[in-house]
Amino acid sequence: SQLDRFMIRLNMGYPDMNNLIEIMKDRHHENPLDKVKHVINKNELINLQELAGNIYVSDEIYEYISKLVEKTREHELIKLGISPRGALAICKMAKAKAMLGGRDYVVPQDVQYIFKDVCSHRIIVESRSMINEVNTDEIMKEIIESVENE
């Protein structure tokens, strides 16, 4: 339940060798936090959050999200599916994605785009899926496809 409190989980991957060398050199002489520049202030962030909160979600999208969540609870390789808190996170992130896409309403593609990042850390997979090396990204993709094909 601790991981359920985080909205999303992103995997940045590892830097290539040249970038790793650059990172080590930069950090050897100075604190990298001294180079951080603000790209947005507190009031602008709050305003964007309010704008995203006002994005329209149709009943069809709520139903679509509910079906995806339900599939996580029914999937044979998932021991523990998405909670109501997770469903709310899907909705919030889909609204933000719609806003960033220049729309004032959510479409299924918004939900699909954020689904893996919002959900992969929230599910607990069965031990047999780990043995078979099935990862959560594959399971999330399969769930989206199964709902699309209904």
Question: Across the structure, where does each feature detected by a protein language model lie?
Answer:
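Conserved AAA+ ATPase core "coupling" helix
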Residues: S1-G53, D59-K67
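C-terminal engagement/docking regions of AAA+ P-loop ATPases
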Residues: T72-E150
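A general boundary/transition motif marking the beginning of the first structured unit of a protein
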Residues: M12, G53-V57, S127, I131, ...
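Helix N-cap and loop-to-helix transition residues
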Residues: D16, I40-N41, S58, S83, ...
